[in-house]
Amino acid sequence: MFILGSFTEEDVREYDLFNANNTREDWELAGETSEYNCMAYAFGAFEWMVPYSYWSGDEKIEEMAKEINLKKKKHIEALRKALYYGDYDHPFAMKLAITRMLKRFKGLRKIKSLKELQKGEYGIAYACGGGDFHFGTYIDGSWSHKMGSLDAEEVECEDDVFGDCYDSRRVYFAMKFSEVGKINFD
């Protein structure tokens, strides 16, 4: 599993995260695998990805609070509780996830609506709810997504991506096709 706050260049090379070395078979690339989830699908990767992993003990709450400029003890405690209980749609948890995505993925920018997409970009929508997060992609007027270990699928509309479960506010991003697979390690 790749945690946005902690994976390294060596991890990307070793696991061939973006299939740069063509280590995966065609059937794996078609989305018929449990090897990657919705986040990986949205960003063109082929290993499970999560925005953070507080519950695993891999990350420290103080460091995560710094990433989103939380200084008050009550705010840091609110973040800790949200992450511990898997409250992905808590405002601080969403801010942490969004901050990490924008920092890690080259060519990614936050937008207010898909109307802001420019030539050479595709849309990504992010929402949370029910103790989970989900991503959908918007390319040339079509929506698609990948639920956990299930196959990727094209759906009729954005609401079909998220259903009733992912009921947080939706956050939209524009991703440059030419930058897929390029990661910031600063």
Model feature map: region roles:
Residues 139-186:
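Active-site or metal-binding loop neighborhoods of secreted/extracellular toxin and effector enzymes
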Residues 59-151:
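...with weaker cross-activation on analogous glycine-rich loops/strands in unrelated enzymes
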Residues 30-57, 75, 90-95, 132-135:
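Active-site nucleophilic cysteine motif
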Residues 10-13, 22, 36-38, 43, ...:
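Alpha-helical structural elements
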Residues 2, 7, 18, 43-46, ...:
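Phenylalanine-focused residue identity feature
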Residues 12, 46-48, 60, 131, ...:
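Short linear sequence elements within intrinsically disordered, low-complexity coil regions
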Residues 14, 26, 40, 51-53, ...:
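Intrinsically disordered, low-complexity N-terminal regions enriched in serine/proline/glycine
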Residues 1-32, 36:
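N-terminal intrinsically disordered, low-complexity, charge/repeat-rich segments that act as generic
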